[in-house]
Amino acid sequence: MLRVFIFFVFLGSGLTGRIKPQITCKYFISENNTWYKYNVTILNGTIVLPAYNTIPSNAAGISCTCHDIDYLQKNNISIHYNTSILKTFQDIRIIRCGMKNISEIAGGFGKELKFLDLRYNDLQVIEYNILRKLIRSNTPTYLYYNNLMCGKRNCPLYYFLLKQEQTYLKLLPQFFLRRINFSNNNTYLYHFLSCGNKPGHEFLEYQTKYCRTKFPEINITVNQLTAKKNTERYKSCYPLVFISILCSCISFLFLFICLLRSICKKYSCTKQGKSGHNYIPLIPSYTFSLKKHRHPETAVVEDHTTSANSPIVYIPTTEEKKVSCSRRK
């Protein structure tokens, strides 16, 4: 019996050594709030996440976990990410798949992203603008249990976090710090994996001082980060600001024209009232004279509005004729 037991033990160990590691992937359907498993294939030594032609079009999320990343690395199996499909997801969870840079999938972050989980990867660099975008959109993001570098490439991130520590320092455990439980006193310490056991504030002060001393060529200062943040914040409001300024200019011009017209009218009226000249009507006035004419039919009308004073024959009415005749009698 002992020999049979030893035989089955060796057989089981041999079989487990030959079993290829599995990559468990699921897609999420929001209509029924359910996750569904699907198989991932290795094609030409490459795994594509999410896989082509395996996820329905109405999927709202993806969750993939690599159970044995060491096997993938030893067998030169690489993982590529399909960012065009990731843009349609609200929930992205890629765990323990050896991701070294968040920018590998940052192009797939759409506006609909509501949850991001990249724990237990090998993230070494995190661009501060990507982290700021995730924070500003209030997206729950889990980046801890990674391997963030203490070197030059993360200096802008340290500057950004130190400046915004009052707001973002509380979120550090959620994003990329790991938690260690000391069983002796049940205390927790948050620190970067490869940057020593320093608390968040002390670590940021140490790292920013280190960056400014060792890498002075990095010209991204705290003030520049803040200015860039404010510029990006109000960048979407520029068209509205331009329209409001244009409307205010038009209204000001209209008021100015109205005020100018009222002043001109008032000035012209006062000037006319002070002058001794009589008001000259627009209709030409005619002076009728009956100079030395016996008959009113030959009366001459003198036009004072013209320089030629050309005579115009005036034909009197019947009543005027009667008045003229009565005067003669």
Curated annotation (Swiss-Prot):
Domain notes: Contains putative leucine-rich repeats (LRR) and a C-terminus cysteine-rich capping motif similar to domain structure of host TLR3.
Keyword Transcription regulation: no
Name of this protein: Transmembrane protein I329L
GO-annotated cellular components: host cell endoplasmic reticulum membrane; host cell Golgi membrane; membrane
Residues in compartment: Cytoplasmic: 261-329
Location in or out of the cell: Host endoplasmic reticulum membrane; Host Golgi apparatus membrane
Stretches that traverse the bilayer: 240-260
Signal peptide start and end residues: 1-16
Function per UniProt: Viral TLR3 homolog that probably prevents TLR3 dimerization and subsequent induction of IFN. Inhibits dsRNA-stimulated activation of NF-kB and IRF3.
Chief location: host cell
